[in-house]
Amino acid sequence: MMVPSFILWDVGSSVYTYGSLFIIALIIWHVRRSHRGLRLGPIKSCTKCFRRIKQKPSDRTLRVKKRTTKEETEKLQKLLSNMKRQGWLPQEGSVRRLLCSDPSCPICNAMALEIQQLLGVENKKTSSSLLRHSRSFSCLEALSPPKVLNDQSSELSKVLNGQSSELSKVLNGQSSELSKVLNDQSSELSKVLNDQSSELSSQHSKDISLPPKFMQSQSTDQKLTLSAPLSTGNTVLQCYHPAPQQQPEPQGSNAFQDVSGLSSSSMDEHGVPANQQKKRKKTKKLVSKNQAAPSEAEMENKMTFFSHWVNPEVKCDRPEESFAFYKSETGAKPKTGEPKKSSAKVRAEEPNLEKHAKDLKAKPLHAKRNI
């Protein structure tokens, strides 16, 4: 007991005992706690948080996929309905050619089958179509990643939209061209109709607006030719009356030839009736040209002049006008046709006629007749 190593035990035996007991208790508590943790696992609150952290990204991906599938199906249905209305549905082999050139590609084959099913279904409900789309998309997801499917669907939608826009442009261009052609044809027809109506109206106005003096002169000439008695004889009367002062001198020769034609026609009415009608028509035309607007006094003077020329025995209260009868060169033989005159003879007679017209203004002429 007197050994120095045992001095501490003797001095602080109480402190040593209490300290050793406290250390032993701590070791036991720690061992028990670790043993409980291995049995029960983590705490419930911690497990819930851990589960939420793990489940959030998976739920989001599923929800996004569902939304995308619904939106895509709705867009496809709208496009198909519009294409069916306007008749723009593609053929069976054209869709597969657009997708891929490799015939053994499983993704393109699946898409082509899906498109054929969509085009073939017309009268089924939307629920069945949605289920079919979901199944097809699930199969495609198993075969390929979702990015490839989204890219292919976007490309298909772009192609369909481009085709629809091109077809609408073509239809609009054709409709505008047809409208232009119809407008041009209608304008041409309206112009033709207006021209025809204007021509008809002008013709009608010309027919209505005939000069009354010309009509009166024609009626008086017809009365004279009908009322004048026929003279019998073998002589040919050539009459001449002076032209008015307003007309030029060459018209005197024309008047002389016209009156001579009238006298020969009146003398030969019994022989040639056909020639008589032709001569009457010629005289009417020449009288209307030479006398464009005759007055009433001139018409009365003509009446008296023609009555004296056809039959000199007819009497009238008016004073006698100056006229002359020339002997015919043919003698007493009657003429059966029109007297033929050469152009040289007519040219030689023109200066004599002008001189004779001047003399007639100064002195009255006497009528001569050869029986």
From Swiss-Prot:
A GO CC term assigned to this protein in UniProt: membrane
Protein localization: Membrane
Bias-annotated ranges (Polar residues): 189-203, 244-266
Pfam families for the chain: DUF4599 (PF15371)
Sequence ranges of Basic residues compositional bias: 277-287
InterPro entries found in the cross-reference section: SPATA31F3-like (IPR027970)
Comp. bias (Basic and acidic residues): 330-362
Keywords: Coiled coil, Membrane, Phosphoprotein, Transmembrane, Transmembrane helix
Highest taxon above the source species: Eukaryota
Topology with respect to the bilayer: Single-pass membrane protein
Disulfide-bonded cysteines: none
Positions where Phosphoserine occurs in the chain: 197-198
Transmembrane intervals: 7-29
UniProt main location, coarse: membrane
Residue ranges of coiled coil: 62-86
Region described as Disordered: spans on this chain: 189-222, 240-299, 326-371
Recorded family membership: Belongs to the SPATA31 family.
Protein name (record): Protein SPATA31F3
Organism in which the protein naturally occurs: Mus musculus
Taxon lineage: Eukaryota, Metazoa, Chordata, Craniata, Vertebrata
